């Protein structure tokens, strides 16, 4: 009986350790490696390009510091079943045509950041509004 209890406790302990894995962080390039950020509103197509290094650093930092992993998976090139979203494209210094994208959108009164095939994170509404506000400047 003691052996059975010991094995049961060991299995539960291992299960708890594996179930409490580290939360995945959004993967963005270093601001110094980015030459331009392009924000495009879908479906309108309104676009703004940001090349000022201080503003690029602020956007990258705001997204990195204000996202929380939802555990959701991204299986598409862009958000599925979301009609209106922002595409935030990052263009890098090191290779011509090398870029990455994060989609920002609102769904059921919550705001999200999604990286294709990587994951979905909650993003603070203030950051979402600040980035989307750049289209109106």
Language-model segment annotations:
Residues 1-9:
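Positively charged n-region of N-terminal signal peptides that target proteins for export
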Residues 92-137:
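Short, well-ordered, aromatic-rich surface patches in folded extracellular/luminal domains
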Residues 25-34:
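N-terminal helix-cap/turn-to-beta initiation motif at the start of protein domains
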Residues 69-109:
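Short, structured surface segments that line ligand/substrate-binding pockets
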Residues 21-23:
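Bacterial signal peptide processing site
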Residues 16-19:
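C-terminal motif of bacterial Sec signal peptides marking the signal peptidase cleavage site
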Residues 39-75:
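Post-signal-peptide N-terminal segment of Sec-exported extracytoplasmic proteins
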């Amino acid at each position: 009986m003691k052996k059975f209890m010991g094995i049961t406790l060991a299995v539960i302990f291992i299960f708890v350790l594996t179930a409490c894995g580290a939360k995945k962080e959004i993967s963005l390039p270093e601001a110094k490696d980015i030459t331009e950020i392009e924000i495009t509103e879908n479906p309108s197509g309104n676009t703004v390009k940001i090349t000022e290094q201080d503003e690029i650093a602020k956007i990258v930092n705001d997204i990195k510091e204000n996202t929380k992993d939802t555990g959701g998976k991204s299986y598409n090139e862009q958000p599925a079943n979301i009609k209106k979203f922002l595409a935030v494209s990052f263009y890098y210094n090191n290779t011509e045509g090398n870029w990455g994208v994060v989609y920002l959108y609102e769904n059921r009164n919550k705001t999200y950041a999604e990286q294709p095939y990587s994951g979905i994170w909650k993003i603070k509404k203030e950051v979402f509004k600040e980035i989307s506000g750049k289209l109106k400047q």
